[in-house]
Amino acid sequence: MTTQETVKNTRTLVGRVVSDQRSKTITVLVERRVKHELYGKIVARSRKYHAHDENNEYKLGDLVEIAEGRPISKTKAWVVTRLVEKARVV
């Protein structure tokens, strides 16, 4: 028999950190653009996800990539995979 490698397709999303108050957890706002069914206008839809941040290294305003994983807590099943863009200091 040959061994087959199973490839897991995990969902990944890119969003902005809107809260980093909790320990080892950040809140990420993910925006997507969809076409309105009836009127055809492009509208922005958004959703917030709680993501695991083991070392508390991501700060407010950072653009991060999150991946779906196993449930870590009641509301947290996403893990931060990488930093896309650091927050700009104004």
From Swiss-Prot:
Q: How does it assemble?
A: Part of the 30S ribosomal subunit.
- Protein family membership: Belongs to the universal ribosomal protein uS17 family.
Ribonucleoprotein among keywords: yes
Coiled coil regions, renumbered to chain: none
For whether the record's keyword set contains Hydrolase, the answer is: no
Q: Which residues cross the membrane?
A: none
Q: Name one GO cellular component term.
A: cytosolic small ribosomal subunit
**Which GO BP terms sit in this record?**
translation
Task: State the Gene Ontology terms under molecular function.
Answer: rRNA binding; structural constituent of ribosome
Query: What is the name of the protein in this document?
Result: Small ribosomal subunit protein uS17
Keywords noted in UniProt: Ribonucleoprotein, Ribosomal protein, RNA-binding, rRNA-binding
The organism named in the record is: Methylibium petroleiphilum (strain ATCC BAA-1232 / LMG 22953 / PM1)
What domain of life does the native source organism fall in?
Bacteria
Fetch the Gene3D superfamilies from UniProt. Nucleic acid-binding proteins (2.40.50.140)
